[in-house]
Amino acid sequence: GFRDGSADRISHGF
């Protein structure tokens, strides 16, 4: 969500 902006929820851009 924050770093990358992919299929995440809070702060996981994976």
From Swiss-Prot:
Phenylalanine amide found at: F14
InterPro entries listed in its UniProt record: Tetradecapep
Any Gene Ontology biological process: neuropeptide signaling pathway
Gene Ontology CC: extracellular region
Keywords noted in UniProt: Amidation, Neuropeptide
Pfam families reported in the protein's UniProt record: Tetradecapep (PF08187)
GO molecular function: neuropeptide hormone activity
TM region positions: none
UniProt superkingdom: Eukaryota
Protein family according to the UniProt entry: To insects allatotropin.
Role played: Has a stimulative effect on the contraction of gut muscles.
Protein name: Myoactive tetradecapeptide
Source species of the chain: Amynthas vittatus
